[in-house]
């Protein structure tokens, strides 16, 4: 079985998530709900984007949830 590295994966949370007052908290919550270990609100251009960091469980590619992309080579 080929296990993938536990790289950072972007969240599917909308960019507006981090622009609200409680955005960072919602960002963390949505990342945790998706099975990620943490979250960052990173400035991308003029919007802060919710990005999840480090999958809590390192899944082989074929067992990953469909919204989790394979890491770029």
From Swiss-Prot:
Disulfide bonds join 6-58, 18-41, 27-50, 31-52. The keyword Disulfide bond applies. Transmembrane segments: none annotated. Keywords: Antimicrobial, Disulfide bond, Fungicide, Plant defense. GO terms for biological process: defense response to fungus; killing of cells of another organism. Belongs to the DEFL family. This is Putative defensin-like protein 42. It comes from Arabidopsis thaliana.
């Amino acid at each position: 079985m080929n296990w993938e590295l536990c790289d950072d994966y972007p969240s599917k949370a909308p960019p507006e998530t981090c622009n609200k007052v409680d955005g960072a908290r919602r960002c963390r919550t949505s990342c945790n709900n998706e099975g990620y270990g943490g979250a960052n609100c990173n400035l991308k251009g003029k919007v802060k984007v919710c990005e999840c960091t480090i999958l809590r469980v390192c899944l082989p590619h074929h067992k990953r949830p469909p919204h989790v992309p394979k890491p770029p080579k």
